[in-house]
Design a protein with these regions (language model features):
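Extended intrinsically disordered or low-complexity regions, especially N/C-terminal cytosolic tails and loops
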Residues: 1-176
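Acidic/aromatic/glycine-rich contiguous surface patches that form carbohydrate-binding/processing clefts
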Residues: 184
Length: 187
């Protein structure tokens, strides 16, 4: 088991079994009477299973949010399937940001997007193709940088929230939890 988990990683799970717990400074690494290494291993596997459970449901939230953003914005801006790169609809500072530019460049390398760009000889594919390949964080930032407060409000209301700022805060909290889970951090 130790080779499966790693000594350093398992150390995070020993902490609750130490006499010095919850004190983080000057830990003495002396275990409470009756403590077995299996307790830390069991805690590790519980944490592992919990992270995977969270990921299962967070994935559904992420896909649902992405779908609603694409659907609602694309229906509002029917005349412009490339609304996600148009400064008429999205803050110019965001469109010019390195993070967004890099995300679009990466999305353009995906087979479906590349085929669209080549087939129609254009520099951008429609939102419903490209946004599928953007990270959750970039999609949230795109939402945050929409110029139309009414659209942001309507999307937020789909989740029962009247404030798009509060909704964005919730989505960013979910994103951080997702990243913790996806990268194996200790919950």
């Amino acid at each position: 088991n130790l080779l499966d988990i790693g000594y350093f990683r398992l150390g995070f799970y020993w902490f609750p079994f130490e006499k010095s717990y919850p004190r983080k400074q000057k830990r003495d690494h002396i275990f409470k009477d009756g403590t077995k290494i299996d307790y830390a291993i069991q805690l590790y596997y519980f944490d592992f299973d919990l992270r995977n459970s969270f990921l299962r449901y967070i994935s559904r939230v992420e896909i649902n949010f992405r779908t609603k953003l694409i659907y609602m914005a694309s229906n509002k801006y029917k005349e412009d399937p490339f609304w996600y790169v148009n400064s008429k609809y999205v803050e110019k500072s965001f469109l010019n940001s390195k993070a967004f530019q890099d995300a679009i460049r990466d999305a353009n390398t995906e087979t479906i997007v590349k085929q669209d760009l080549n087939r129609y000889s254009r520099s951008h594919a429609p939102a419903w193709k490209v946004l599928e390949y953007l990270s959750f964080g970039v999609v949230i930032s795109l939402f945050d940088n929409l110029k139309d407060g009414g659209l942001k409000h309507a999307i937020s209301m789909e989740y029962g929230m009247g404030s798009s700022t509060q909704f964005s805060n919730y989505m960013n909290t979910i994103r951080r939890l997702r990243n913790f889970c996806a990268h194996g951090k200790v919950l």
